[in-house]
């Protein structure tokens, strides 16, 4: 695999070169400005191209080494793009309001995440919130929704991220300051009104246009996926050539799967699939419904079946990361 390709023409078509009005600028961005046209600063794309490449390389290297990338974009036009890109690349995101202390007070945030998971178990588990009055269930449901909106994108992060990718450092200034305080590198899109100081991987570009944001997120997601592939290679894992998992042979619909063979039930004691990143009790149940009960089955998935299972459980792009995890967890079980 390789880093995603892009051209200056793509950047132009997405409007990456358009900055803010010339009176709304940060003089520290002067080295990245090509000139002024119709009272609008024009960003020098000859600098954006290599800067973006460096940022993508940092993302890929971080993921290849087993690190976590946190996408941060809470402005309206970035929210959906950021969440989609993070999900597809098995990474994490904050696209609602950045809560002060999300990084610097991780212990408290972890407690809130634990509360979110507890509420989900209470409201969607076998008891379905029984034992509570209708009003109490409504209150708990509202609390769950509020926590999920704020923390849903980092609920499975398990610790501090190793790299932040930020859209608009002015709006996300608290996130940037927290990362800098903890020594976490930041890759960021910097418009002409931003401050590049302290940004490890600055990428001069339009941080307002929807098409530009979509392009950035797509490229960063693909860079993260490249890192996942490189990480597998470094571990000597060939996803399509894993040793066959120890599962019972059952007749399946011809052509339904590439090589995966579902089980009608666990062979002995089922493995705790919730140990895989992003697997909640609900996702584990969906995997069981598909005939997946053991880490060995996940470790043996080829790319086609991994993609299909991801689509079935509603986490496209996440299963590739599970394959490497399952390989290690399967060895521990043995």
Swiss-Prot record:
Coiled coil: none annotated. It comes from Xanthobacter autotrophicus (strain ATCC BAA-1158 / Py2). HAMAP family: Ribosomal_uS2_B. GO terms for molecular function: structural constituent of ribosome. SUPFAM superfamilies: Ribosomal protein S2. Belongs to the universal ribosomal protein uS2 family. GO terms for biological process: translation. The gene is rpsB. This is Small ribosomal subunit protein uS2. Keywords: Ribonucleoprotein, Ribosomal protein. Gene3D superfamilies: Glucose-6-phosphate isomerase like protein, domain 1, Helix hairpin bin. InterPro entries: Ribosomal_uS2, Ribosomal_uS2_bac/mit/plastid, Ribosomal_uS2_CS, Ribosomal_uS2_flav_dom_sf. GO terms for cellular component: cytosolic small ribosomal subunit.
